[in-house]
Amino acid sequence: MLRVAWRTLSLIRTRAVTQVLVPGLPGGGSAKFPFNQWGLQPRSLLLQAARGYVVRKPAQSRLDDDPPPSTLLKDYQNVPGIEKVDDVVKRLLSLEMANKKEMLKIKQEQFMKKIVANPEDTRSLEARIIALSVKIRSYEEHLEKHRKDKAHKRYLLMSIDQRKKMLKNLRNTNYDVFEKICWGLGIEYTFPPLYYRRAHRRFVTKKALCIRVFQETQKLKKRRRALKAAAAAQKQAKRRNPDSPAKAIPKTLKDSQ
C-alpha cells in the first residue's frame, strides 16, 4: 500500500509540474504538454499504480488442440445459409470476437466429443470433471498474467480439490473411464496421504526435540561401541602377550638367589 501511494504521489507531482501557467492566455490559463504525442498517459493514476504488477507478455494457452479463431460459435454453427454470409459477419460470429465464456463452451464441447461416449450428457461425473478441468486451465492462464490475484488463486485451489474428489470417486466406480479421462485431459493422479496432521507450533517443536534426542542417543551408543571395541582390543593384546610384569618379578628373584 505504501508503494502504491508513493507512485500516485509522484505521478500527481509530475502532472502538476507539467501544467505551466502562461500569461498570454486569456483568464490566466495553463498550457499542457502533449502527452499523447509522447505516448504518456497522465490519467487513471491509481490504475497505473495498482496494476503495475501485471505481466505484459501475453499468456500462452496450455491446450495444444485449441479451436482456430475462425470457427463459428455454438449457437450459429447449425444455422441454414451461414456459409453465404459476408466475411465481416462471419468474423463477428466467430471465436475471434467472442468472450471468454463462449471460448470455454467450445473447449468443453471439444473435449466432450473426444473423451465421453455420450457428449449430450452433461450431468455425468465425467462431464463435470471435464468442465472443471476447462475452468482450471482458464484460471491458470489468468494467473500467469495476474500473479497477485488472490481471489482467482483461491478459486483455482478450490476447483482442484473438487476435481480430486471427483476423480477419486470415478476411480473407485469405473476405472476404465478414469484412465481415459486422465489420458485425454493430461491429468496425473496422485494418491492422497493416508494420514494427515496439521503442523502447529507445538507439534513442530516436539518433533524437533525428538529428533535431537534421537541424535544424542545415537552419539552415546557410538561412544559405547568405541569403548567396548577398545577394551576388547586390550584383552586380545594381553592374551597374545602372556608374560606380565607380575610374573617376571619372581623369576628375577630366583636368578639372584
Curated annotation (Swiss-Prot):
Transit peptide: 1-57
MF terms (GO), sorted A to Z: RNA binding; structural constituent of ribosome
Presence of the UniProt keyword Membrane in the record: no
Signal sequence interval, chain numbering: none
GO cellular component, one term: nucleoplasm
UniProt protein name: Small ribosomal subunit protein uS15m
First-listed, main subcellular location of the protein, grouped into a coarse class: mitochondrion
Keywords: Mitochondrion, Ribonucleoprotein, Ribosomal protein, Transit peptide
Pfam families from the UniProt entry: Ribosomal_S15
Database matches in PANTHER family: 28S RIBOSOMAL PROTEIN S15, MITOCHONDRIAL, SMALL RIBOSOMAL SUBUNIT PROTEIN US15M
Keyword Ion transport listed: no
Homology family: Belongs to the universal ribosomal protein uS15 family.
